[in-house]
Curated annotation (Swiss-Prot):
Binds 1 Mg(2+) ion per subunit. HAMAP family: TMP_synthase. One of its GO terms (biological process) is thiamine diphosphate biosynthetic process. Pfam families: TMP-TENI. It comes from Chlamydia caviae (strain ATCC VR-813 / DSM 19441 / 03DC25 / GPIC) (Chlamydophila caviae). This is Thiamine-phosphate synthase. It catalyses: 2-[(2R,5Z)-2-carboxy-4-methylthiazol-5(2H)-ylidene]ethyl phosphate + 4-amino-2-methyl-5-(diphosphooxymethyl)pyrimidine + 2 H(+) = thiamine phosphate + CO2 + diphosphate; 2-(2-carboxy-4-methylthiazol-5-yl)ethyl phosphate + 4-amino-2-methyl-5-(diphosphooxymethyl)pyrimidine + 2 H(+) = thiamine phosphate + CO2 + diphosphate; 4-methyl-5-(2-phosphooxyethyl)-thiazole + 4-amino-2-methyl-5-(diphosphooxymethyl)pyrimidine + H(+) = thiamine phosphate + diphosphate. Its cofactor is Mg(2+).
Amino acid sequence: MEEDFFKLILITDRQNIPMEEYLDFVSACVQSGVTAVQLREKGLSHRELLSFGGALKSILDPLDIPLIVSDSVSVCLDLDASGVHLGQTDGDVIEARELLGPDKIIGWNVHTLDQLLNANTLPIDYLGLSALFATENKPEATDLWGFSGLEQAVSLCEHPIVAVGGIDESNAGNVVEAGAAGIAAIGAFHSAHNPGLATKALREIVDRGLRC
């Protein structure tokens, strides 16, 4: 697993897509430049998450691409996933680190500056800054970070920042140039007519921005 696994994260949103079709989609994205996959399926049971996660791991493990589980330490442990991405209401980060050990990835979502500052002392690997811009997947998000908020967050944060929310080819370069270590997205992948080509283009944009 590369240290910069958070460079380009695909967040899942399978909905009613048949499993084999969705796995083909994920495979195309991974082969074209996605550096990690985040399993985020709010409506699934623990058992269903294990089934879906196991199918994803069959694609990701041979390529050494990490699978990060949203919200659930127990699913992460049962899957032996690479890590977990926790929100503010998903439990205690210190307890999660004790359960997962030192080698699992822990991402921590923040929505406010106070949450970001509090995260500086937490045993996490990266911080998810959400939401950066308006997005259909989180219509309830009103306090958006924007570019100015991102730049302030980068100057104050002790952890790598992964920007989340409303990021696509039109703004991804500016996001990483502003200091984000990576981006995570749903729509930029799922709404693409050709997911493989869209991923390749997005990865090239991110790589250029990180070199600036």
